[in-house]
Amino acid sequence: MKIPKGVTIAGVFVKIIREDLRDEDHHPKGYFGYYSHERRVIAIDKGLTPAAARDTIRHEMIHAALAMSGLDHLEHFEEEAVVRCMEEIFFPAYERFLRNLNRKKT
């Protein structure tokens, strides 16, 4: 999967970069990516598989949307719960929509 250079969220361009997100012993730090609102950057770990990279970018896009909506004042664990809930609701519905749309085209 080719990673896009960025994505526009709420009219704001957010750059997507790959970083080594492992510690000095090359162990995962416990996360696959992050969103920096100050830098307008989504960073994902260099070692992710294409599917994991896609899922991580989608996850961080939700964090970015929350921040741009002024909803980034939550505690980390609260924001993470909101993001995961939104992932479970929105993305399956969107993927079903795309499948149905593709069926109608054929």
Predicted features along the sequence, with ranges:
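Metalloprotease/metallohydrolase-associated module, dominated by Zn2+-dependent proteases
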Residues: 1-52, 68-106
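Active-site recognition of the HExxH zinc-binding catalytic motif
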Residues: 55-67
